[in-house]
Regions:
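Short, well-structured alpha-helical interface segments that form or flank functional binding sites
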Residues: 26, 61, 99, 179-183
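Generic structural hydrophobic/aromatic packing signal, biased to beta-strands
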Residues: 15, 31, 104, 186-188, ...
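C-terminal, charged low-complexity interaction regions
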Residues: 129-317
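Sequence-level detector for tyrosine residue identity
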Residues: 2, 12, 58, 89, ...
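Intrinsically disordered, low-complexity boundary segments flanking structured domains
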Residues: 13-19, 88-91, 174, 182-184
């Protein structure tokens, strides 16, 4: 099991997915695929701020990958996602969740890898990095799950993710994405589709939001509605108070992964109490383009602003 978080080795002379370290067989690939920039009509010069406050252009962010792994496994996945994205919701909604999980997970982990590489370079050593053991475990597990791209990993009767793919009313929605690294939560919108994903929750967020997901089934969401749905996922991912644990069973060429019961010895619910005021602060951030204030959002503390006819909000504490 390759786990760079055990040694904090995020160098660019080894594959970021497999850990193979042979300079002659490494390829540098863009973190944001060229096909995605092309579809989004972006030049690659657009800038993004990393956690260390440095400003980088999209095109300057690259990742080292084993050439054969890239050609045999990653490129076919990229081509599958590219084809679906080019069509829009009709095809994106048909993608296997496993493929979306690997693609989104690679995208998100790519930022983590680049961030860690930059941080260690700046410090000159990994000794000064301050990362909790729970976060190290979460990231290490996520990286291991991504090895499903090129090895036979089997999730035994569970999915480690919650992924929602929704249709957007605006068929020409510009490409944008956001993420929360600590909770491995990701969302993006593009053309006529939106995706919200929690990558290590064993499907609990999908269950937590099942009422609103059922309510919007078959409906195209407005831009405000998609941001509201995203805000709910980001907030509930924050409230999720378990660190999933797994049993790994190698058997010949296959590795079986079993999820340990989330409840364990704990009696308390899997999610901390939903607080409308805190949720309102999250929603305010997601609704910035429309200028709604926190006061407007929680004017009625019992019924926060919602763009859904039937809000289906979780019960607040």
């Amino acid at each position: 099991m390759y786990n760079p978080f055990l040694t904090f080795d995020f160098s660019y002379n080894k594959c970021f997915l497999s850990g193979k370290a042979t300079n002659t067989s490494l390829t540098q690939i863009p973190l944001l695929p060229k096909w995605l920039l092309k579809q989004a009509e972006l030049s690659g010069d657009e800038q993004i701020k990393l956690l260390d406050e440095s400003i980088r252009s999209y095109s300057s962010l690259e990742l080292p990958i084993d050439t054969s792994l890239n050609n045999e496994f990653l490129t076919p996945l990229e081509q599958k996602i590219e084809k679906a994205f080019s069509t829009g919701y009709a095809e994106v909604s048909k993608l296997e969740e496993n493929d979306l999980f690997i693609w989104i997970g690679k995208f998100l982990y790519g930022f983590v890898y680049a961030e860690m590489n930059a941080a260690i370079k700046a410090e000159g050593t990994a000794a000064g990095l301050n990362m909790s053991q729970s976060l190290i475990k979460r990231f290490g597990t996520h990286q291991f799950f991504l090895q499903k791209l090129y090895s036979d990993l089997v999730f035994e009767n569970f999915k480690p993710w919650s992924i929602a793919v929704v249709e957007l009313a605006d068929k020409n929605t510009p490409f944008s994405f956001r993420d929360e690294i600590n909770t491995l939560t990701f969302s993006m919108k593009f053309k006529d589709f939106g995706i919200v994903a929690c990558l290590q929750d064993n499907g609990t967020n999908a269950i937590f939001h099942q009422e609103i997901l059922k309510e919007i089934e078959g409906k195209a969401l407005s831009a405000e509605q998609f941001e509201e749905l995203s805000a709910r996922y980001y907030y509930s991912a924050y409230l999720f108070n378990r660190l999933p644990d797994y049993t790994i069973v190698p058997l010949k060429e296959t590795t079986f992964i079993e999820n340990m019961p989330l409840r364990g010895a704990f009696d308390k619910p899997l999610f901390d109490v939903w607080q409308n005021k805190v949720y309102g602060q999250v929603l305010e951030n997601f609704l910035k383009p429309w200028g709604f204030t926190l006061f407007e959002i929680i004017k009625d503390p019992e019924k926060p602003m919602s763009f859904f006819e039937n809000p289906c909000l979780p019960t607040a504490g």
